[in-house]
Amino acid sequence: MPRHAPIPTPRPAPTKDVFGAAAKEVLDTAQRYLSNPVRHVVISPGSETVWDDCCGGTLYVRVVSVSPVTQANAALGTCALLGWTVTMALGTVRCASAIDSQGRAPKDKDLTEDALYLTQDAADLGQMLMCETNAANVSWAPQGPDGGCMSGEWQFDLRVGACACPETR
């Protein structure tokens, strides 16, 4: 376990994790909208999600970036924070048809079925984003297929409120 530098006193009171809370809320809501079940439901760390068990299906959300929204006169003082713009990605990982053990390519009907499975996920999650969140700058993109897996994810911005500036203890 890495050791961390001591925190000087006085120090700010702990801050509520509004980014993680927003990700969890999006994920919980998205589960209710999916037409096709998934085995895994995760908040993914980092810039990508794991494709290891794609045939079980994965619903994921990840935080892509965070930017402060400040008052126009932010340079004049401290605590000019109005909120945060949290860019997130919400998607699914699914099984995709692949070359079989005898080197034969997947059949057309199987590839079409795969594509329609993914576009159904896109429709379900897109509907959720438009009906249940304040999402802006919303776009969907497929990924893969690769190694028998495929994915599609929505990227979008959420406006998350800011807490009052912390007081020192």
Where are the language model's segments positioned?
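Acidic-leaning, charged glycine-interspersed low-complexity segments
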Residues: 31-40, 51, 111-164
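Short, solvent-exposed secondary-structure capping/transition elements
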Residues: 95-103, 167
